[in-house]
Amino acid sequence: MGTNLSVPNPLGFFPDHQLDPAFGANSTNPDWDFNPIKDHWPQANQVGVGAFGPGHSPPHGGVLGWSPQAQGILTTVPTVPPTASTNRQSGRQPTPISPPLRDSHPQAMQWNSTALHQALQDPRVRGLYFPAGGSSSGTLNPVPNTASHISSISSRTGDPALNMENITSGFLGPLLVLQAGFFLLTRILTIPQSLDSWWTSLNFLGGSPVCLGQNSQYPTSNHSPTSCPPICPGYRWMCLRRFIIFLFILLLCLIFLLVLLDYQGMLPVCPLIPGSTTTSTGPCKTCTTPAQGNSMFPSCCCTKPTDGNCTCIPIPSSWAFAKYLWEWASVRFSWLSLLVPFVQWFVGLSPTVWLSVIWMMWYWGPSLYNIVSPFIPLLPIFFCLWVYI
Protein backbone atom coordinates (compact mmCIF):
# COMPACT_ATOMS: atom_id res chain seq x y z
CA MET A 1 0.00 0.00 0.00
CA GLY A 2 1.21 3.43 -0.80
CA THR A 3 3.80 2.38 -3.39
CA ASN A 4 1.67 2.69 -6.54
CA LEU A 5 2.49 6.08 -8.04
CA SER A 6 -0.21 5.82 -10.70
CA VAL A 7 -3.12 6.39 -8.34
CA PRO A 8 -4.94 9.44 -9.77
CA ASN A 9 -5.68 12.07 -7.17
CA PRO A 10 -5.54 15.48 -8.89
CA LEU A 11 -7.52 17.46 -6.30
CA GLY A 12 -5.94 16.07 -3.17
CA PHE A 13 -9.22 15.15 -1.51
CA PHE A 14 -8.13 11.59 -0.75
CA PRO A 15 -5.45 10.40 1.66
CA ASP A 16 -1.90 9.81 0.49
CA HIS A 17 -2.30 12.46 -2.20
CA GLN A 18 1.45 12.92 -1.93
CA LEU A 19 1.69 9.82 -4.16
CA ASP A 20 0.11 11.65 -7.10
CA PRO A 21 2.74 12.48 -9.76
CA ALA A 22 0.80 15.67 -10.48
CA PHE A 23 1.97 17.02 -7.11
CA GLY A 24 5.66 16.18 -7.68
CA ALA A 25 5.72 12.74 -6.04
CA ASN A 26 8.53 10.45 -7.10
CA SER A 27 10.62 7.66 -5.70
CA THR A 28 13.22 10.00 -4.24
CA ASN A 29 10.68 12.31 -2.58
CA PRO A 30 7.54 10.30 -2.04
CA ASP A 31 6.33 12.33 0.89
CA TRP A 32 6.21 16.02 -0.04
CA ASP A 33 3.13 16.68 2.14
CA PHE A 34 4.36 17.41 5.67
CA ASN A 35 0.95 16.96 7.26
CA PRO A 36 1.76 15.23 10.57
CA ILE A 37 -1.79 13.98 11.13
CA LYS A 38 -2.61 12.75 7.64
CA ASP A 39 -4.48 9.48 7.38
CA HIS A 40 -3.41 6.47 5.39
CA TRP A 41 -5.49 4.60 2.92
CA PRO A 42 -7.18 1.97 5.22
CA GLN A 43 -8.34 4.68 7.60
CA ALA A 44 -9.65 6.78 4.70
CA ASN A 45 -12.57 4.42 4.27
CA GLN A 46 -13.88 5.45 7.67
CA VAL A 47 -16.21 8.43 8.18
CA GLY A 48 -14.21 11.25 9.68
CA VAL A 49 -15.07 14.60 11.23
CA GLY A 50 -13.75 17.48 9.20
CA ALA A 51 -14.34 21.17 8.69
CA PHE A 52 -17.81 20.61 7.21
CA GLY A 53 -19.15 18.03 9.64
CA PRO A 54 -19.27 14.21 9.56
CA GLY A 55 -18.91 12.61 6.17
CA HIS A 56 -18.42 15.86 4.25
CA SER A 57 -14.63 15.89 4.13
CA PRO A 58 -11.85 13.29 4.38
CA PRO A 59 -10.40 12.51 7.78
CA HIS A 60 -7.08 14.16 7.00
CA GLY A 61 -8.47 17.70 6.95
CA GLY A 62 -10.29 18.61 3.75
CA VAL A 63 -10.15 21.79 1.70
CA LEU A 64 -9.54 24.01 4.75
CA GLY A 65 -6.27 22.36 5.71
CA TRP A 66 -5.19 20.23 8.61
CA SER A 67 -5.36 22.79 11.43
CA PRO A 68 -7.39 21.95 14.58
CA GLN A 69 -10.19 24.22 13.35
CA ALA A 70 -10.30 22.33 10.02
CA GLN A 71 -10.46 19.00 11.88
CA GLY A 72 -13.53 20.23 13.80
CA ILE A 73 -11.60 20.80 17.03
CA LEU A 74 -12.31 24.22 18.56
CA THR A 75 -9.88 25.36 21.22
CA THR A 76 -10.50 28.50 23.25
CA VAL A 77 -7.28 30.36 23.92
CA PRO A 78 -7.48 32.96 26.69
CA THR A 79 -6.43 36.43 25.68
CA VAL A 80 -3.42 37.91 27.40
CA PRO A 81 -4.12 41.38 28.82
CA PRO A 82 -1.65 44.08 27.87
CA THR A 83 0.98 44.90 30.39
CA ALA A 84 0.63 48.16 32.26
CA SER A 85 2.99 50.89 31.20
CA THR A 86 5.44 52.02 33.82
CA ASN A 87 6.54 55.12 31.92
CA ARG A 88 4.47 58.01 33.35
CA GLN A 89 6.25 60.59 31.23
CA SER A 90 4.71 59.35 27.95
CA GLY A 91 1.08 60.18 28.86
CA ARG A 92 -0.81 63.33 29.83
CA GLN A 93 0.69 65.11 32.79
CA PRO A 94 -1.62 65.91 35.72
CA THR A 95 -2.86 69.49 36.01
CA PRO A 96 -0.84 71.34 38.62
CA ILE A 97 -2.58 73.05 41.50
CA SER A 98 -3.38 76.69 40.76
CA PRO A 99 -1.45 79.15 42.91
CA PRO A 100 -3.35 81.44 45.26
CA LEU A 101 -4.91 84.61 43.81
CA ARG A 102 -2.65 86.85 45.88
CA ASP A 103 0.34 85.26 44.18
CA SER A 104 -0.99 85.06 40.60
CA HIS A 105 -2.89 88.41 40.53
CA PRO A 106 -1.50 90.69 43.23
CA GLN A 107 -3.06 93.78 41.58
CA ALA A 108 -6.55 92.43 42.27
CA MET A 109 -5.93 92.23 46.00
CA GLN A 110 -5.25 95.93 46.41
CA TRP A 111 -8.92 96.80 45.65
CA ASN A 112 -11.20 96.69 48.66
CA SER A 113 -14.62 98.31 49.08
CA THR A 114 -13.15 101.59 50.30
CA ALA A 115 -10.59 101.83 47.52
CA LEU A 116 -13.20 100.96 44.87
CA HIS A 117 -15.59 103.62 46.17
CA GLN A 118 -12.83 106.22 46.10
CA ALA A 119 -11.84 105.24 42.56
CA LEU A 120 -15.41 105.65 41.35
CA GLN A 121 -15.37 109.28 42.51
CA ASP A 122 -12.90 110.03 39.71
CA PRO A 123 -14.86 111.51 36.73
CA ARG A 124 -12.75 109.58 34.25
CA VAL A 125 -13.47 106.25 35.94
CA ARG A 126 -17.08 107.23 36.62
CA GLY A 127 -17.71 107.90 32.92
CA LEU A 128 -16.73 104.33 32.07
CA TYR A 129 -19.40 102.78 34.29
CA PHE A 130 -22.24 105.33 34.45
CA PRO A 131 -23.83 107.14 31.50
CA ALA A 132 -24.66 110.82 31.61
CA GLY A 133 -27.13 111.56 34.38
CA GLY A 134 -26.63 108.19 36.04
CA SER A 135 -26.30 107.53 39.74
CA SER A 136 -23.58 105.62 41.56
CA SER A 137 -26.05 104.12 44.00
CA GLY A 138 -27.68 100.81 43.25
CA THR A 139 -26.59 98.56 40.45
CA LEU A 140 -24.17 99.61 37.76
CA ASN A 141 -25.64 100.36 34.36
CA PRO A 142 -24.20 98.11 31.68
CA VAL A 143 -22.13 99.52 28.89
CA PRO A 144 -24.32 100.14 25.85
CA ASN A 145 -23.93 97.73 23.00
CA THR A 146 -22.09 99.48 20.20
CA ALA A 147 -21.78 96.45 17.96
CA SER A 148 -23.02 97.05 14.46
CA HIS A 149 -25.85 95.19 12.82
CA ILE A 150 -23.44 93.66 10.35
CA SER A 151 -21.40 92.09 13.11
CA SER A 152 -24.55 90.61 14.63
CA ILE A 153 -25.45 89.13 11.28
CA SER A 154 -21.98 87.72 10.72
CA SER A 155 -22.04 86.12 14.16
CA ARG A 156 -24.88 83.82 13.20
CA THR A 157 -23.95 80.23 12.78
CA GLY A 158 -26.42 79.53 9.97
CA ASP A 159 -29.29 80.82 7.89
CA PRO A 160 -32.84 80.59 9.27
CA ALA A 161 -35.00 77.74 8.06
CA LEU A 162 -37.28 78.56 5.15
CA ASN A 163 -41.02 78.57 5.68
CA MET A 164 -42.05 75.80 3.31
CA GLU A 165 -45.75 76.51 3.85
CA ASN A 166 -45.48 80.01 2.38
CA ILE A 167 -43.35 78.76 -0.49
CA THR A 168 -45.82 75.98 -1.28
CA SER A 169 -48.82 78.30 -1.17
CA GLY A 170 -46.96 80.77 -3.35
CA PHE A 171 -46.45 78.10 -6.00
CA LEU A 172 -49.84 76.39 -5.75
CA GLY A 173 -51.86 79.60 -6.09
CA PRO A 174 -50.61 80.61 -9.56
CA LEU A 175 -50.57 76.97 -10.62
CA LEU A 176 -54.26 76.50 -9.78
CA VAL A 177 -55.16 79.78 -11.50
CA LEU A 178 -53.23 78.72 -14.60
CA GLN A 179 -54.92 75.33 -14.64
CA ALA A 180 -58.39 76.85 -14.22
CA GLY A 181 -57.67 79.43 -16.93
CA PHE A 182 -56.45 76.77 -19.35
CA PHE A 183 -59.53 74.64 -18.66
CA LEU A 184 -61.87 77.58 -19.26
CA LEU A 185 -60.00 78.47 -22.44
CA THR A 186 -60.40 74.97 -23.84
CA ARG A 187 -64.08 75.01 -22.94
CA ILE A 188 -64.62 78.46 -24.45
CA LEU A 189 -63.01 77.36 -27.70
CA THR A 190 -65.67 74.66 -27.97
CA ILE A 191 -68.49 77.25 -27.86
CA PRO A 192 -68.21 78.30 -31.54
CA GLN A 193 -68.20 74.68 -32.70
CA SER A 194 -71.23 73.82 -30.56
CA LEU A 195 -73.16 76.86 -31.76
CA ASP A 196 -72.13 76.12 -35.32
CA SER A 197 -73.51 72.60 -34.97
CA TRP A 198 -76.76 74.00 -33.58
CA TRP A 199 -76.94 76.57 -36.38
CA THR A 200 -76.42 74.02 -39.15
CA SER A 201 -78.85 71.57 -37.55
CA LEU A 202 -81.65 74.07 -38.19
CA ASN A 203 -81.26 73.39 -41.92
CA PHE A 204 -81.47 69.62 -41.46
CA LEU A 205 -84.50 69.08 -39.26
CA GLY A 206 -85.08 65.38 -38.75
CA GLY A 207 -81.81 64.32 -40.37
CA SER A 208 -78.07 64.37 -39.91
CA PRO A 209 -76.26 67.48 -41.22
CA VAL A 210 -74.32 66.79 -44.40
CA CYS A 211 -72.10 69.29 -46.18
CA LEU A 212 -73.65 70.42 -49.45
CA GLY A 213 -70.25 71.07 -50.98
CA GLN A 214 -69.84 67.38 -51.81
CA ASN A 215 -72.12 67.75 -54.83
CA SER A 216 -70.09 70.61 -56.28
CA GLN A 217 -67.46 70.57 -59.01
CA TYR A 218 -64.75 69.51 -56.55
CA PRO A 219 -66.34 66.82 -54.38
CA THR A 220 -64.74 65.82 -51.11
CA SER A 221 -65.21 62.94 -48.72
CA ASN A 222 -68.28 62.69 -46.56
CA HIS A 223 -68.02 65.16 -43.66
CA SER A 224 -70.10 67.40 -41.44
CA PRO A 225 -70.70 71.05 -42.41
CA THR A 226 -69.06 72.10 -39.14
CA SER A 227 -65.71 70.52 -40.09
CA CYS A 228 -65.19 71.37 -43.73
CA PRO A 229 -61.64 71.08 -45.10
CA PRO A 230 -60.11 74.12 -46.82
CA ILE A 231 -60.68 72.62 -50.29
CA CYS A 232 -64.42 72.30 -49.63
CA PRO A 233 -66.66 75.11 -51.00
CA GLY A 234 -68.47 75.16 -47.66
CA TYR A 235 -65.28 76.12 -45.82
CA ARG A 236 -65.87 79.85 -46.38
CA TRP A 237 -69.41 79.62 -45.04
CA MET A 238 -68.16 77.76 -41.97
CA CYS A 239 -65.60 80.52 -41.28
CA LEU A 240 -68.31 83.16 -41.73
CA ARG A 241 -70.57 81.41 -39.25
CA ARG A 242 -67.72 81.10 -36.73
CA PHE A 243 -66.93 84.82 -37.09
CA ILE A 244 -70.56 85.78 -36.48
CA ILE A 245 -70.66 83.51 -33.45
CA PHE A 246 -67.49 85.12 -32.03
CA LEU A 247 -69.04 88.57 -32.47
CA PHE A 248 -72.19 87.37 -30.76
CA ILE A 249 -70.20 86.02 -27.79
CA LEU A 250 -68.25 89.29 -27.54
CA LEU A 251 -71.49 91.28 -27.63
CA LEU A 252 -72.95 89.06 -24.94
CA CYS A 253 -69.93 89.66 -22.68
CA LEU A 254 -70.12 93.43 -23.24
CA ILE A 255 -73.82 93.46 -22.40
CA PHE A 256 -73.17 91.56 -19.20
CA LEU A 257 -70.37 93.97 -18.29
CA LEU A 258 -72.63 96.95 -19.01
CA VAL A 259 -75.39 95.52 -16.82
CA LEU A 260 -72.90 94.87 -14.04
CA LEU A 261 -71.49 98.42 -14.17
CA ASP A 262 -75.00 99.85 -14.21
CA TYR A 263 -75.95 97.77 -11.18
CA GLN A 264 -72.86 99.00 -9.33
CA GLY A 265 -73.79 102.63 -10.09
CA MET A 266 -70.72 103.28 -12.23
CA LEU A 267 -72.67 104.72 -15.18
CA PRO A 268 -73.66 108.30 -14.21
CA VAL A 269 -76.45 108.85 -16.73
CA CYS A 270 -78.91 111.68 -16.18
CA PRO A 271 -82.51 110.50 -16.18
CA LEU A 272 -85.13 112.16 -18.33
CA ILE A 273 -87.52 114.68 -16.87
CA PRO A 274 -91.12 113.51 -17.35
CA GLY A 275 -92.66 115.46 -20.21
CA SER A 276 -89.31 116.66 -21.54
CA THR A 277 -87.39 115.19 -24.43
CA THR A 278 -84.38 117.52 -24.36
CA THR A 279 -81.54 117.13 -21.96
CA SER A 280 -78.32 119.02 -21.44
CA THR A 281 -75.33 118.47 -19.26
CA GLY A 282 -73.87 121.90 -19.87
CA PRO A 283 -72.71 124.26 -17.12
CA CYS A 284 -75.36 125.73 -14.85
CA LYS A 285 -75.09 128.76 -12.58
CA THR A 286 -77.77 127.76 -10.11
CA CYS A 287 -80.32 125.00 -9.77
CA THR A 288 -83.99 125.86 -9.50
CA THR A 289 -84.72 122.56 -7.74
CA PRO A 290 -82.28 121.11 -5.18
CA ALA A 291 -81.19 117.52 -5.59
CA GLN A 292 -82.92 115.00 -3.35
CA GLY A 293 -81.65 111.69 -2.04
CA ASN A 294 -78.21 110.29 -1.43
CA SER A 295 -76.19 109.25 -4.44
CA MET A 296 -72.67 107.99 -4.97
CA PHE A 297 -72.15 110.54 -7.71
CA PRO A 298 -72.98 114.26 -7.65
CA SER A 299 -76.21 115.60 -9.10
CA CYS A 300 -76.38 116.60 -12.74
CA CYS A 301 -78.47 119.20 -14.50
CA CYS A 302 -80.77 117.39 -16.87
CA THR A 303 -83.03 120.08 -18.31
CA LYS A 304 -82.08 122.58 -20.94
CA PRO A 305 -80.58 125.68 -19.26
CA THR A 306 -82.68 128.85 -19.41
CA ASP A 307 -80.83 132.03 -18.55
CA GLY A 308 -78.13 129.92 -16.95
CA ASN A 309 -80.53 128.08 -14.62
CA CYS A 310 -81.54 124.43 -14.78
CA THR A 311 -83.35 121.76 -12.82
CA CYS A 312 -81.06 119.42 -10.86
CA ILE A 313 -82.01 115.77 -10.49
CA PRO A 314 -79.80 113.28 -8.63
CA ILE A 315 -78.38 110.37 -10.54
CA PRO A 316 -79.73 107.05 -9.23
CA SER A 317 -77.19 105.05 -7.30
CA SER A 318 -78.15 101.90 -9.23
CA TRP A 319 -79.70 101.10 -12.61
CA ALA A 320 -79.28 104.68 -13.84
CA PHE A 321 -78.65 103.63 -17.43
CA ALA A 322 -81.52 101.12 -17.40
CA LYS A 323 -83.93 103.77 -16.12
CA TYR A 324 -82.71 106.16 -18.76
CA LEU A 325 -83.32 103.57 -21.51
CA TRP A 326 -86.78 102.79 -20.15
CA GLU A 327 -87.74 106.47 -19.98
CA TRP A 328 -86.38 107.04 -23.46
CA ALA A 329 -88.29 104.02 -24.86
CA SER A 330 -91.47 105.11 -23.05
CA VAL A 331 -91.25 108.53 -24.71
CA ARG A 332 -90.66 107.00 -28.15
CA PHE A 333 -93.16 104.14 -27.76
CA SER A 334 -96.08 105.20 -25.61
CA TRP A 335 -97.66 101.74 -25.61
CA LEU A 336 -94.81 100.43 -23.40
CA SER A 337 -96.25 102.35 -20.46
CA LEU A 338 -99.37 100.15 -20.71
CA LEU A 339 -97.28 97.09 -19.91
CA VAL A 340 -96.10 98.42 -16.55
CA PRO A 341 -99.30 97.61 -14.56
CA PHE A 342 -99.53 94.16 -16.13
CA VAL A 343 -95.89 93.35 -15.30
CA GLN A 344 -96.31 94.61 -11.73
CA TRP A 345 -99.46 92.52 -11.29
CA PHE A 346 -97.82 89.40 -12.77
CA VAL A 347 -94.73 89.75 -10.60
CA GLY A 348 -96.92 90.22 -7.53
CA LEU A 349 -98.47 86.78 -8.10
CA SER A 350 -95.46 84.85 -6.91
CA PRO A 351 -97.09 81.37 -6.81
CA THR A 352 -98.39 81.82 -10.34
CA VAL A 353 -95.02 83.01 -11.57
CA TRP A 354 -93.20 80.07 -10.03
CA LEU A 355 -95.69 77.55 -11.38
CA SER A 356 -95.35 79.06 -14.84
CA VAL A 357 -91.59 78.88 -14.68
CA ILE A 358 -91.72 75.25 -13.52
CA TRP A 359 -94.11 74.34 -16.32
CA MET A 360 -91.99 76.06 -18.97
CA MET A 361 -88.81 74.39 -17.72
CA TRP A 362 -90.51 71.00 -17.75
CA TYR A 363 -91.88 71.50 -21.26
CA TRP A 364 -88.99 73.32 -22.91
CA GLY A 365 -86.24 72.18 -20.60
CA PRO A 366 -84.44 69.68 -22.88
CA SER A 367 -84.56 72.05 -25.84
CA LEU A 368 -83.42 75.00 -23.75
CA TYR A 369 -80.57 72.96 -22.31
CA ASN A 370 -79.32 72.11 -25.79
CA ILE A 371 -79.36 75.81 -26.64
CA VAL A 372 -77.88 77.09 -23.37
CA SER A 373 -75.30 74.33 -22.81
CA PRO A 374 -72.67 75.89 -25.14
CA PHE A 375 -72.72 79.04 -23.00
CA ILE A 376 -72.16 77.24 -19.69
CA PRO A 377 -68.34 77.82 -19.78
CA LEU A 378 -69.04 81.57 -19.79
CA LEU A 379 -70.78 81.40 -16.41
CA PRO A 380 -67.52 81.26 -14.37
CA ILE A 381 -66.26 84.35 -16.24
CA PHE A 382 -69.49 86.22 -15.52
CA PHE A 383 -69.31 85.18 -11.88
CA CYS A 384 -65.73 86.48 -11.54
CA LEU A 385 -66.71 89.79 -13.11
CA TRP A 386 -69.67 90.06 -10.75
CA VAL A 387 -67.55 89.43 -7.67
CA TYR A 388 -64.44 91.49 -8.44
CA ILE A 389 -66.04 94.55 -10.07
From Swiss-Prot:
Residues 109-163 are annotated as: Pre-S2. Keywords: Acetylation, Caveolin-mediated endocytosis of virus by host, Fusion of virus membrane with host endosomal membrane, Fusion of virus membrane with host membrane, Glycoprotein, Host-virus interaction, Lipoprotein, Membrane, Myristate, Transmembrane, Transmembrane helix, Viral attachment to host cell, Viral envelope protein, Viral penetration into host cytoplasm, Virion, Virus endocytosis by host, Virus entry into host cell. GO terms for cellular component: membrane; viral envelope; virion membrane. Residues 2-108 are annotated as: Pre-S1. A lipid is attached at G2 (N-myristoyl glycine). The chain crosses the membrane at residues 171-191, 243-263, 338-358, 365-387. Residues 2-170, 264-337, 388-389 are virion surface. Residues 2-242, 192-242, 359-364 are intravirion. Residues 84-95 have a biased composition (Polar residues). It holds the Pfam family vMSA. Its main location: virion. It is found in: Virion membrane. Residues 79-103 are annotated as: Disordered. Isoform M is N-terminally acetylated by host at a ratio of 90%, and N-glycosylated by host at the pre-S2 region. Belongs to the orthohepadnavirus major surface antigen family. The large envelope protein is synthesized with the pre-S region at the cytosolic side of the endoplasmic reticulum and, hence will be within the virion after budding. Therefore the pre-S region is not N-glycosylated. Later a post-translational translocation of N-terminal pre-S and TM1 domains occur in about 50% of proteins at the virion surface. These molecules change their topology by an unknown mechanism, resulting in exposure of pre-S region at virion surface. The large envelope protein exists in two topological conformations, one which is termed 'external' or Le-HBsAg and the other 'internal' or Li-HBsAg. In its external conformation the protein attaches the virus to cell receptors and thereby initiating infection. This interaction determines the species specificity and liver tropism. This attachment induces virion internalization predominantly through caveolin-mediated endocytosis. The large envelope protein also assures fusion between virion membrane and endosomal membrane. This is Large envelope protein.
